[in-house]
Amino acid sequence: KFTNCVTFKNTADFFLNFNYLNFNNETILVKGARHFQFEEIVTALEEKTHETVLEINLNAISHNLNFYKSKLKATTKMMVMVKAFGYGSGGFEIAKLLEHHKVDYLGVAFADEGISLKNAGIILPIMVLNPETTSFSAIIQHHLEPEIYSLKGLNAFLEIAEKRKLKHFPIHIKLDTGMHRLGFEEEDLDELIATLKGNQFIAVKSILSHMATSDDLEQQDFAHAQLHLFEKLSAILMTELQIKPIRHILNTSGISNFPEAQYDMVRLGIGLYGVSNDPEEQKFLENVG
C-alpha cells in the first residue's frame, strides 16, 4: 500500500498535470518500459530544476516611473527603454503598464523586440536603437522607427523607402557627441544634410545623442562639452533642414544630474527598475523584483 501517491493513466496524462507537481529536494526514480517514453519525463524534470521565476512588482515599477516623472518639466516627453525585453522583467507586461501611464515612446535594442511588442498589441511608438540593415523591411512592415547613426545605414534605409514609395516614414538621427560608439560626427553633417534635404520618403522624428559620463559627477566638464556639442550640431540640422524634431540626450542618471538639458524628451532606462548610481536617490526608489 502506497501513501501520498498520485497516479496517471499514461505518460500523456502525466504531462497534463506536470505544471501542478512540486518537487523539492527529492530523489526521483524513473523506471518503465521503453514504449512509455519515460525519457520525455526525464527531460521535463531536468528542465524544471533549472527554471527560475522572477516576480515583478508592477506597483514598484509605477512608483519609480512617477519618481522620475516628477523631475521633469510639464512639457518634457518620456521615452522608456524596454530593451532586452525589459531588462529581463517581461517586455510586454512592462510595455502595457507604460502605455497605461501614458509615456510617449518605447525604446528597444533590436527590431525583433519591437516586433514582439507590436504583435502583442502595443500601440505606443517604438524606436529601435540598433537596427541592422537586414531588419529594415521588417521595421517598416511593423511600423517601428529606426535609429539611424551612419550614412551607410541611412542610404540603405532610403533605398528600401524609395522602393516602397513611403511618405515621411519616421526615423531618428543619432549624433556622436563623445560616446564614440555610434552616431554622426560633425564632419558628417554636410553629407547628412544633403541626403536628407527635400527627401519625401522619410521624416526626422527626433535627433538624439548619448551621454558617456552622466553618472559621474567628477566628469562634469566632459558632460557639459557633450551637451554643448549636441546643442550645436542639432541646431545646424534643424536650421538647414527647416525642421523641429524632438531632441533628447538624457538617460536615467542624466535626468537627475543635468535637469537643464531635458530638451523635448528624456530616456528612462534602468532607473525604472529601481537602480540608481546615486545613494541618496536610491532611497526613493523601490525594488521591483
Q: What is each stretch, according to the model?
A:
Residues 38-54, 115-121, 278-289:
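C-terminal helical cap(s) of enzyme catalytic domains, especially alpha/beta-barrels
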Residues 2-9, 49-51, 123-132, 145-149, ...:
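Short hydrophobic/aromatic-enriched beta-strand-loop microsegments
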Residues 53, 60-64, 70-71, 84-97, ...:
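Active-site loop/helix belt of alpha/beta enzymes
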Residues 46-57, 96, 141-146, 219:
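Glycine-rich tight-turn/loop motif centered on a GG-T
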Residues 1-63, 70, 111:
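ATP-dependent carboxylate-amine ligase
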Residues 1, 34-35, 111-113, 131-134, ...:
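Short, polar loop motifs at secondary-structure junctions
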Residues 70, 74-144, 148-157:
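N-terminal active-site wall of soluble small-molecule enzyme domains
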Residues 28, 106-107, 126, 247, ...:
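Hydrophobic residues within beta-strands of alpha/beta enzymes
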